[in-house]
Amino acid sequence: MKIFDYENIQLIPNKCIVNSRSECDTTVTLGRHTFKMPIVPANMQTIINDSIAEFLAENGYFYIMHRFDGAARIPFVKKMKERQWISSISVGVKKEEYLFIEELAKQKLASDYITIDIAHGHSNSVIEMIQHIKTHLPETFVIAGNVGTPEAVRELENAGADATKVGIGPGKACITKIKTGFGTGGWQLAALRWCAKAARKPIIADGGIRTHGDIAKSIRFGATMVMIGSLFAGHEESSGETKIENGIAYKEYFGSASEFQKGEKKNIEGKKIWIQHKGSLKDTLIEMHQDLQSSISYAGGRDLEAIRKVDYVIVKNSIFNGDAI
């Protein structure tokens, strides 16, 4: 198996067939809905909140609400359904989560999407939760993760998952690879390729995205959707504290298994970092959209499918040659 990551890959351009990149279609279908772009902000406390979820849903973007305010999820699903926007939430695998799924069913509040969100998703606990959701909410699109092997993808698909989330510890705020010695950090793109070859259902690439070009690379190697954390951190709309240092504004960004999220020093696999303030989330989404349209034009097509067919080269060291990203 070839081992590489985003910084080791360069996609090879084809003849451009559009007169303007604005002709390129970045839409993607996941389940019963079509979205503006194949991107989703990470379901982390400093990345997604109610107001951001509402903005994304209203404007045709996919989102996954985090699971760290359990009591707020039923009111959230109700609100999104009342506004006729998609509802997309996260669950864990503890006993109370089973009761939560049953309560959704009892109230006839089937969320459009439910993501089973644990660090090591290739486990009996995730398989049992997939089956529980499908029993009580059969119409819900279930995303299960996180995983890093073809065996895990197939097993979760066979259990009933409609999509799997690939990536163990490659994110900027994740230290799983350091704390445990395991994960896809440093070879996330190769792991995505490996898993995609076995997958029969959509894959969400999760983690390791450092540039907008990495979105196109994820699509090339099999992702239907790309989950992004650090690039969506630090915006005006983002949750988390703001601090000023030497006249420059920063916003906090922490991993989902950090002590800042957990509130305790136990099984820590995340850290807190400060991200320079980036301004408006809307501006970042516009730039991502334009860059992805450019990627499609370089691929020689009019839609995302063109990116899946391009050739690539593996660069020996890094495409950045020491330049700051």
Curated annotation (Swiss-Prot):
GO terms for cellular component: cytosol; GMP reductase complex
GO molecular function: GMP reductase activity
Family classification: Belongs to the IMPDH/GMPR family. GuaC type 2 subfamily.
UniProt keywords, alphabetically: NADP, Oxidoreductase
Active site, UniProt feature: C174 (thioimidate intermediate)
Superkingdom of origin: Bacteria
Keyword Phosphoprotein: no
PANTHER family linked to this entry: GMP REDUCTASE
Pfam families: IMPDH (PF00478)
GO biological process, one term: purine nucleotide metabolic process
Residues annotated as binding NADP(+): 203-226
Protein task: Catalyzes the irreversible NADPH-dependent deamination of GMP to IMP. It functions in the conversion of nucleobase, nucleoside and nucleotide derivatives of G to A nucleotides, and in maintaining the intracellular balance of A and G nucleotides.
SMART domains found in the cross-reference section: IMPDH
CDD domains recorded: IMPDH (cd00381)
Catalytic reaction(s) noted: IMP + NH4(+) + NADP(+) = GMP + NADPH + 2 H(+)
Protein name in the entry: GMP reductase
EC number from the UniProt entry: 1.7.1.7
Keyword Oxidoreductase among UniProt keywords: yes
